[in-house]
A protein has these predicted regions:
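Metallocofactor- and cofactor-centric catalytic cores in central/energy metabolism, strongly enriched
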Residues: 1-262
């Protein structure tokens, strides 16, 4: 998974000293129906905005706390990225927006009936928010209300930078308070342990590459399937923290083939 070794000594010192915001108590919304009947939304911290929307403002002290709504009809390749952090590699995201906003993968999963439906609207944040007060008090509740209005059942939240790990966790907590089951991909296990999102899957990739590699639909789908495994098979109590690694999720059981008797 991601590691602080990716970063300069100065950034490592900052991350060590930073007062991570612990979620307490940890809210929990159980998954009460099969994913094949669920409406699923995405939340990205990559600072993505659609054509005609204002970009995120990289001059806001502590990070731009606003959010953007990305419609399900969005062409992923046309999204603009305005993430202020310079500590992670943006090149993969420039090549394939699905690395942080896998809307194309979600459409494919809906087409095969793995999920019930793609939500009509999705959430975009600029996740490098070192002062998350407004995010917690204003932005996350407003964003959650938008998904509730769309009758969203499940949200998958995706970070790209070190502080993004905290941002998606804080948003997930508010979504859970408002009755939406969530799972966060996490790039730093130590942040997941300190902040405590309701459900987290630590992924073995560096920052900027939360779903693996660009232009790798099969690999990106495997990551989403692992996130869905956490939702479907980890009943709590919260917080649930798992790692995507060899043996987890376990391979599917082979189908039983009935051989007719002679």
């Amino acid at each position: 998974m991601g590691s602080t070794r990716e970063f300069s000594f100065g950034i490592r010192l900052f991350l060590k000293a930073y007062p991570w915001r612990k979620i307490h108590p940890v809210p929990w919304t159980p998954l009460t129906k099969p994913l094949a009947e669920c409406t699923v939304a995405l939340g990205t911290s990559a600072g993505l905005s659609a054509s005609g929307q204002p970009p995120f403002d990289d001059h806001v002290r502590g990070g731009d706390p606003t959010f953007r709504i990305l419609p399900a009809s969005t062409e992923v390749a046309t999204l603009q990225e305005n993430h202020r952090s310079t500590v992670f590699d943006h090149s993969g995201l420039h090549r394939d927006r699905n690395l942080a906003f896998p809307l194309d993968r979600l459409r494919e999963l809906a087409a095969t009936r793995r999920i019930g439906a793609v939500a009509p609207q999705h959430l975009s944040f600029m996740g490098s928010q070192t002062a998350p007060g407004r995010l917690v008090k204003e932005t996350a509740p407003a964003a959650a209300a938008r998904l509730r209005a769309d009758k969203v059942d499940v949200a998958v939240l995706i970070p790209v930078c070190p502080v993004c790990n905290q941002t998606v966790a804080l948003v997930a907590a508010e979504l859970e308070r408002q009755g939406i089951a969530t799972v966060c991909l996490m790039l730093l296990r130590e942040v997941a342990e300190r902040v405590r999102p309701p459900r987290a899957l630590c992924v073995p990739f560096r920052h900027g590459y939360p779903l693996g590699q660009p232009d790798d639909p099969a690999g990106q789908t495997r990551v989403l399937e692992a996130a869905f495994y956490v939702l479907e098979n980890e009943p709590g109590p919260a917080p649930v923290l798992r790692e995507l690694r060899s043996g987890y999720p376990p391979p599917p059981e082979p189908a039983t083939i009935e051989v007719p008797e002679d």
